[in-house]
Amino acid sequence: MKLLEQARKFREAFGQEVLECVSRYGFINSRLYQMQTALVAEEATEFLKAADELYADPENDKCKENFLKEASDLVFVVYQHCAAHGFDLDTAMDRVFESNMSKLGEDGKPIYRKDGKVLKGPG
């Protein structure tokens, strides 16, 4: 089951609103937008804390488990935010993957910035 389908099932099971679109004027339900955005911010903070704890103690199994749990929670609430407003994040993620895989130089090798970030290729 794709993550978007899981997000929609969760919203349905728990009586959470699902809008079919965002209007041309922006988010059409400010209460829903603010709630979902607050959840993403909360989970992002928890994820970053777990990442710092794992960085400080990379061999600690509890830190590893907590990092994975917080990463999953963050992804879940981002999917919830998108599902609530009718966005298909699975399709968007497929497009990002395809775009990222095209980031090769003319020689077929990745191009890196000094800090290690992969840069877009000529195509």
Regions found by a protein language model. Name each.
Residues 1-71, 75-123:
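Flexible "arm" and connector segments at domain edges
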